[in-house]
Amino acid sequence: KTAEKARLEAAPPRGYQPIEGPVAYNNAVQNLLFGADSAIIRDGRVVTAQALGGTGALRIGADLIKRVVPGATVYISDPSWENHRALFEAAGFPVDTYPYYNPETRGANAEAMIAKLNSLPAGSVIVLHACCHNPTGADLTEAQWAEVVKACANRGLIPFLDMAYQGFADGIEPDAVAVNLFSASGLSFFVSSSFSKSFSLYGERVGALSIVTQSKDESARVLSQLKRVIRTN
């Protein structure tokens, strides 16, 4: 409370922020997700926009994908955070599931999950829990994530990683293993970030959407379309 009061008293008048949010905030989000020395940041292959929590980031991403791939089907894990289905259905997508949890082992059923991904049509959107799977808490190993990345590449799938609990499993950097593997793959993908839990700012709706592209030029085009989506939300 003391720190908040000091910042409020010292703050200059508030002007308009960019549509995509404060540059410093978006840069910090990228450094946290991808690492400060990330090649995709250095090459301008990622764009980030501030969002109203992870929910807002998911919805902005869903609306953008709907403009680009309107006939896609979205696949979420079985089980998944209940709002995943509601968000993508509200954006106009049919939503199906891929197998994820094995109640006998109380762990992830990676074999069944990857087999399902390898059967999906190109252009399908795959919502993935980057760490701390909700509601099971069962995460994939690094080797299993590598197989997921390979399946997405082979089938031409659209990965959408939901990072709501970075730092709550094994630490900030270890929890980014899925993001790092996708970054190294050369694929385009989406990442929704929520910092409500990480920063204990539950009432502030602190989130972001990051989109990894194929080039700096493509990033500029994606950012232009992303701004249009944000302005209409």
Model-derived regions: residue spans:
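Walker B catalytic acidic pair
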Residues: 163
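Short catalytic/ligand-binding loop motif for oxyanion handling, primarily in non-cytosolic enzymes
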Residues: 1, 135-136, 200-201
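Conserved core segment of the aminotransferase class I/II
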Residues: 184-233
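Phosphate-/polyanion-interacting regions in eukaryotic proteins
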Residues: 1-7
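Conserved core of the PLP fold type I
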Residues: 12-156, 166-168, 172-183
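Generic detector of contiguous secondary-structure segments
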Residues: 11-17, 188, 193
